[in-house]
Amino acid sequence: MRLLSDEERAVLVPAEFDRFDSPIPTRIVASEEFFPLAQTPAQREVEARLSRLADTLAPRQGVSRRRFLRSAAGMAAAFLAMNEVYGPLFGVSRAEAADPGLADERARTLADQFIFDGHTHFLREDTRIETFVRMREAVGKAGWNPALIDKPQTLEDLKFENYVKEVFLDSDTKVALISSAPSEVPQDWFLTNPMTVAARARINEQAGGRRMFAHAIFTPGQPGWLDEIDRAIEQDQPDSFKGYTIGDNTHKDLSRHPWRIDDEKRVYPAYEKFAAAGLKNVCIHKGLFPPSVERQFPHLRPYVDVSDVARAAKDWPQLNFIIYHSGYRFPGGGTPEEALAAFEATGRVEWVTDLAEIPQKHGVTNVYGDLGQVFALTAVSQPRLAAVIVGQLVAGLGHEHVVWGSDAVWTGAPQWQIEGLRRLEIPDDLQASFGFKPLGPADGPVKNAIFGENSARLYGFEITRFAQRPDRLSALKADYLAAGGERSNLRYGYVNPG
């Protein structure tokens, strides 16, 4: 997979090189989907403030700096540092960072919150993405991570076993949906459709209950794609289908089959098959296509925004169109500050606002916005923008049409993102100027809906029944935590050292 050029990759370093073991990223971490921005002055200030807090509070709590930063109190300290830099966006107090008992009690209170992560990934066993192996070898040689020194490295951190640890043991996630991505090169699919449903079966069997859902990927225009839908429906029995209108997001230079959601001749036959099979949820990758990428691949630009969503939603009211990344355009090649400034001047966030306006403009109720990657990117780089994006989606789509996704494991264990949304509130000045309503408490109706109730409804999952029947995975997590299990605070990808 070669999404970044050799020249771009040469100036980046592995995210695991980051010496600062922060509970939340203090710089943007990118997969090869986009070129990450350099650490901003504000992010450097957050890092410095958190470092000082750790140096002060860890000795008082009788723990190492590393242990502190992996604790609930350390997580609170990270959001405290962010508030000091960006303003009061996150609900946290210095007392929570200073008192591990208080922090742990809050964590226990929220631990049973139902969280359905509708946007997760891991890589197949025979993946060719060797860049991540080289990254981990370099980490070991540099001595940054003692666990990697003098040990041959593999991609296990991006594969099944570590996925289970980071998603189900190191976070409050209760249910997840495993996704994939297609390619013109068959071996460069993240997971094939049979691999994806095999992972679902493996986790559910180990758990003794329903913990995992699975996509099947559909690829309009590729040879045999309709036959593959038929095969997947009959043999794999996926919970939903996912498509990439960009065609091949992995090898954009090879993408020969981009498509539009509202293409009657090419794509509507797939919707007919989905509807006939009772598969109502159509997940679509949109956005993450900044101007820098557009300059490289201008021919793909007509396929990556959300201009094709409304017509398809209107033509297919029996289906739900879940737009991944909520169409957010600027993951790199345009700064979050620029996006925030544009919003403050125009009231718009490119492509997110377009998505949020679809229900009012077109009278549809079957369009959903997914927070995967978009929340992670903006929360760590410009949390006011994260608040704006969530606020716009809630205002336009309705809080019952916004769904949680983390894009783990690329972003590491998703607990920092979960805590970010739990604590996030839209600042008073944005509420007054733009009419946003408060998001409310961590376990209030808006956030409970986003975190899990909406996806549970979409996928027919009974939350009450789940809560009443602890399974083997619940017991495994309890044993893991009792034995002192902790988050790694690792992320997998590239950072810009500038």
Map each language-model feature to its residues.
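Active-site gating loops and adjacent loop-to-helix segments of metal-dependent hydrolytic enzymes
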Residues: 38, 126-158, 290-295, 364-368, ...
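C-terminal segment of N-terminal export signals and the immediately downstream linker at the start
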Residues: 3, 55-63, 83-120
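Active-site gating/metal-coordination segments in enzymes
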Residues: 182-304
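N-terminal secretory signal peptides
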Residues: 1-63
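Acidic (Asp/Glu)-rich catalytic clusters
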Residues: 164-172, 193-210, 229-238, 272-277, ...
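Catalytic pocket-lining loop regions of alpha/beta-barrel enzymes
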Residues: 248, 255-404, 412, 429-440, ...
